[in-house]
Amino acid sequence: MIWMPMDKKDQLAELISNAETSFYNGQLQEAFSLSLSAIKLDENCADAYQYAANVCMSLSRYKDAIEYYQKVQIYIMLITQIEMNL
């Protein structure tokens, strides 16, 4: 995740937490909507893409799920490279 003001970080954390809760409560459309809101707030948030992908898998939207999972993989690789260079 790229540096951002704390209130934006808090907002992102809340969106991800709510997406997770909605997903595990079977509220898939709500989880997807929250995930997309998180992505709009921070397009580098792997967790947001992860929940969007999980929802798509649950709804048998496999092509969309693959696209979101690929973004998760890209961001994880970038984070790993950054951490290795620190």
Question: What feature does the model see in each segment?
Answer:
Residues I2-E14:
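TPR-adjacent "capping" and linker segments in tetratricopeptide-repeat scaffold/adaptor proteins
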Residues Y24-N25, S58:
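Register position in tetratricopeptide repeats
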Residues S37-K40, Q73-I74:
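Conserved structural position within tetratricopeptide repeats
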